[in-house]
């Protein structure tokens, strides 16, 4: 008997293979079957499937956001100053509102799917690893399993928020240029907020709705005010209808600054989270592969457990005449069926 957890592990494997509690099994067989049951069959495949799902989702969201923004931008090239085509600008606003709804719905649904899969993974791993010691489990410590789950879901959540913000903040750099031209101040200047507030306030006085008079508004003013009329950009100003108002200028300036900051900070956060997430998973994979090189691991994963009932072993015949096969059709979960007949002397 090796370790306090070995009896529990033996009983668990007996239940998996349909053996009676009184059946005796060898320690080497227990280690072999527990190893294959955990790392090669169920636990490793579940974790790999979850990691694959997360990475596919991340790749999909990054490609989709970049693609749709580029496609909408290419279809409306003349919406930007200094030659603002108002029809194209309205088309861009409509497309942005539609994409915003689509990505919010897509992101929320995928978050729920990944969360359900993560909960299933943690419950399944807890069930599989319950009888095993830390040295034999896929995760070295139970806490590491939850750290892995929390980190992965935070990573997915950040990707989702970042994808939605990329749609919301599309054209934000052009709006910053509009504000710089209107205020004659650099965005990096400490006085930019005050100067931009005064410039936009004066613009609203001279450039009345529908903000299409190039002579009074200028190309930058037309682009700025018409861009803020979209439903997506109304979230920036708190306006329920129409476009920018005097009361919404501070919120608009804050939103533009936040979008600019998002484009600088979020990619760094994503990169750090991705590196940590992949290093953690890589460490677990290497740990599993190193265990496969142990001399106690038998390569034939399809050998069923052999057993004999306590008290029935005699010295003359040994255990060979009492060996029996696993009932036909029964397998360890995840292992292919076999037809095993013990060799007779």
Swiss-Prot record:
The entry's keywords: Membrane, Transmembrane, Transmembrane helix
Topology term for the membrane: Multi-pass membrane protein
GO CC annotation terms, alphabetical: membrane
Subcellular location: Membrane
TM spans (from-to): 46-63, 101-118, 147-165, 265-286
Signal sequence, start to end: none
Domain of life: Viruses
Record bears the keyword Transmembrane: yes
Protein name according to UniProt: Putative membrane protein ORF59
Name of the coding gene: ORF59
